[in-house]
């Protein structure tokens, strides 16, 4: 289950989500969620002033691709902030 929460405050939208495994979940699905989470946490850990933005994608790819998953390279995000998606 994916829970997506949006808040609007003082002219700005904020957005977050979390994935929960519910019931009997296939091992392949469990692995996908785990690798996704692991790559996200590794990418966040890397982020700091003066770090190269492009390296974030490399960090994610280096975790998910050896596990047989791929990264969507043309995704550009969505409108959030003053404009809601």
Q: For each predicted feature, which ranges?
A:
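Active-site neighborhoods and metal-handling regions in enzymes and metal-associated proteins
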Residues: 1-85
């Amino acid at each position: 289950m994916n829970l997506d929460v949006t808040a609007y405050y003082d002219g700005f939208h904020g957005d977050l989500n979390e994935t929960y495994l519910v019931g009997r979940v296939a091992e392949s699905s469990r692995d996908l969620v785990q690798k996704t989470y692991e790559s996200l946490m590794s990418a966040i850990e890397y982020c700091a002033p003066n770090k190269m933005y492009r390296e974030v994608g490399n960090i994610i790819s280096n975790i998910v691709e050896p596990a047989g998953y791929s990264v969507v390279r043309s995704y550009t995000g969505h409108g959030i902030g003053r404009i809601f998606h």
